[in-house]
């Protein structure tokens, strides 16, 4: 058997990748009125401009069910669970409670990805690749932690109000992002969203996003992910510029944000994740 990797649906990994590497996925929830929709399981149409649409983490019971299934599938080799930043979601805390309830602290290792979207997904992918090569529980855990701590994430949003309302961004940062600039460039720092810099035009914002990603990538090759919501053309342009400026690029993924993150980021959001050294 082999170590099994678990992540949550906000990680945004393609279904084909999840299936190929045997990654287990815990669905998070989008709340539309009185209806709770499981991300990635049930189809959903969302008005991302609505103030009434919210999200919620999986419960400890839901997490425990997935962890127990993964542990059985591992044949006792263990589970590494890589989840969205605990600063942005209650998912990691639900996972910790599930592990306590299972009394399985030695067999189920939790990793705070310090990120969201593919900033969670690529560390989970790094762990799953290591598991597929026969890695031990410690080695698979270390692969996830290494990728997560190296990762650098930069996000452009049209509005910061949704992030502030959901508690994902400070009131001060939200003010500077919404009142004084056209396109705020945010970054994840130790799992928290912070305002990195300000751009008054869309073109300057894209240029600064690319520059930040290139600087973070370094010269030794990197894994890069570009994510967006309703900004496919801009995402492809940014991806093309990154290909040109990072000739040693090891991996490049372009994908759309899933519903849980999209609720908070809003239409037009565009993000770049960089993992220096890659996530093999």
Kindly give the residue locations of the regions a language model identified:
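N-terminal glycine-rich anion-binding loop in soluble enzyme alpha/beta folds
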Residues: 3-65, 69
